[in-house]
């Protein structure tokens, strides 16, 4: 939430270069961490630096290009989003398996340094800056509210819903978020303006993106677990299975950006969400005999749907805002996607765990087996039942996203309103 204030108050170069420096320092600390506490602090520092990058990139696109030009450039934005999942899991899996976890930081550090040098040379300042006063109370409420919610939700998969720390941090987080919203409504220059929700199409778009992220991030977290735990493959294998899908999404993001300029968001998002619904349904019937080639193919087709459904909606949503609300819209989009992704991961992992624990085997399915063999089969079936339940949740969420696309306005109607 702080990114809107930072982007509006400071220049593009100041924000980007500072973000890269902070991320670089966090990366160095992570690589040389002597214990888990230091590693956790390093990851927080990294997040402080990288958290501003996506809203800054989106705001820059909105500031530079007119609404009718943004489709292809938002597609390039999607390319960046797609390439990270394409490279990250595969590279990290290889480094962890064949070197050690510190290598993750050693590889990223020089890339960060090169990025800083390139930014120093090429990045120019864009947009109009607003010298708004710093409201300390808003900053505190924002950190306590969104930080508490994210911590609580992300802890569900390890500690469960009934854990007092989880419940208290989520409840307190919600209370502080409500207080944060109340505070913003009373400030002349808010830290994060909630006026963006006065536009119904922006609200619908944000809802679609949030619901889609719940399904997308949740599935992307759980699918590698299925590959490793059920199919008995290595972390490198799980990364390679997801690699084609991430590459396809990166390419399709550019294509969908150009298609948006011709067809608008409504048609593309409907087709995209339908593809995602159908392909996610396949995950509900996977078992220990599932072919990794088939799984990789289905996942790649699913990512075509994600690219068609997500990027045009993102462009359509941001096009609804006036220039002075661009930074607030970008920050709101990024914040809600982060929260939704955490909810998706926590939701799927929790359902998976609970369903596995409550699996009731049918004795007739294991007749003639030795006790050791029978216990092994029951354990595998319990895991598969858990994964099926988790992915069924993802299917239901995706159907909700599909239904929401019907609330988007047609391109023809939007053109008539603009004239």
What do the predicted segments below correspond to?
Residues 29, 33, 45, 49, ...:
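Residue-level hotspots within pore-lining transmembrane alpha-helices
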Residues 36, 127-132, 156-162, 288-289:
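Membrane-interface helix caps and helix-loop-helix hairpins in membrane proteins
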Residues 1-137:
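Helix-loop-helix hairpins in multi-pass membrane proteins, especially solute transporters
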Residues 23, 46-47, 75-85, 89, ...:
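Structural signature of transmembrane alpha-helices in multi-pass secondary transporters
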Residues 117-136, 182-191, 406-416:
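Helix-loop junctions on the cytosolic side of multi-pass membrane transporters
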Residues 368-380, 408-419:
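Intrinsic disorder in cytosolic terminal tails and internal cytosolic loops
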Residues 135-143, 269-271:
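Select subsegments of transmembrane alpha-helices in polytopic membrane proteins
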Residues 8, 13-16, 20, 107, ...:
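12-transmembrane solute porter fold
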